[in-house]
């Protein structure tokens, strides 16, 4: 499948659903908004010219400096055309994404994992609950603002003969993270010095 022709036909067919298309390292990437995601994935699965019938994975990425800090990534495979495509959408902490379990039944566990690790809420999910962390776990551990030590210490108490959870005392309640790389600024100044 020719990437340029494929993208042109997709943009012509779905101009409201696709914000941007790009090919990076032989990977096809589409950007869409959360409101159009369900319709776009339905189209990509069932249309004759696409047939992306296999959902390979759903994952999340946290970019705290962005207004829509969470990027949710859907990786699809078309066995008929031997092609892969990546669909990206971005949401903030309170905007839900429509669940795609009704299109791809395998999405159930991946959406649960993304919710458990990042806190991205999937509306209309049949069973949205934690999948990797404990039932009483507080927070979402793959967020960049989640403390490395966590909020509680879980250990086995030999005197009580059971597992106990105790809150960790934080010396620092809130930390500000500067995610800008100091190396980027140095490389820019080196380039200007060479000119």
UniProtKB/Swiss-Prot annotation:
Cited NCBIfam families: NuoC_fam, PRK06074.1-5
Designated name of the protein: NADH dehydrogenase [ubiquinone] iron-sulfur protein 3
GO MF annotation, one: NADH dehydrogenase (ubiquinone) activity
Lineage: Eukaryota, Viridiplantae, Streptophyta, Embryophyta, Marchantiophyta
Transmembrane feature ranges: none
Pfam families the UniProt entry points to: Complex1_30kDa
Organism: Marchantia polymorpha (Common liverwort)
Chain's role: Core subunit of the mitochondrial membrane respiratory chain NADH dehydrogenase (Complex I) that is believed to belong to the minimal assembly required for catalysis. Complex I functions in the transfer of electrons from NADH to the respiratory chain. The immediate electron acceptor for the enzyme is believed to be ubiquinone.
UniProt entry keywords in alphabetical sequence: Electron transport, Membrane, Mitochondrion, Mitochondrion inner membrane, NAD, Oxidoreductase, Respiratory chain, Translocase, Transport, Ubiquinone
GO CC entries: mitochondrial inner membrane
Main location: mitochondrion
Gene field: NAD9
Family per similarity comment: Belongs to the complex I 30 kDa subunit family.
Cellular location(s): Mitochondrion inner membrane
EC numbers on record: 7.1.1.2
Catalytic activity: a ubiquinone + NADH + 5 H(+)(in) = a ubiquinol + NAD(+) + 4 H(+)(out)
Assembly and interaction partners: Complex I is composed of about 45 different subunits. This is a component of the iron-sulfur (IP) fragment of the enzyme.
């Amino acid at each position: 499948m020719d990437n340029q022709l494929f993208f042109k036909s997709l943009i012509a067919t779905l101009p409201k659903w696709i914000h941007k298309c790009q090919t990076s390292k032989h990977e096809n990437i589409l950007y869409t908004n959360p409101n159009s995601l369900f319709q776009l994935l339905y189209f990509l699965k069932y249309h004759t010219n696409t047939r992306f019938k296999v959902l390979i994975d759903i994952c999340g990425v946290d970019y705290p400096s962005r207004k829509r800090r969470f990027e949710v990534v859907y990786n699809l495979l078309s066995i008929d055309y031997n092609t892969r495509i990546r669909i990206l959408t971005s949401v903030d902490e309170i905007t839900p994404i429509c669940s795609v379990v009704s299109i791809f039944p395998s999405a159930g566990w991946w959406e649960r994992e993304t919710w458990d690790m990042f806190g991205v809420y999937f509306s209309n999910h049949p069973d949205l609950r934690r999948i990797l962390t404990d039932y009483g776990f507080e927070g979402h551990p793959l967020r960049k603002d989640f403390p490395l030590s966590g909020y509680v210490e879980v250990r086995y108490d030999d005197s009580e003969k059971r597992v106990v959870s105790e809150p960790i005392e934080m010396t620092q309640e809130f930390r500000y993270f500067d995610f800008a790389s100091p190396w980027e600024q140095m490389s820019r100044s080196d380039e200007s010095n060479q000119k």
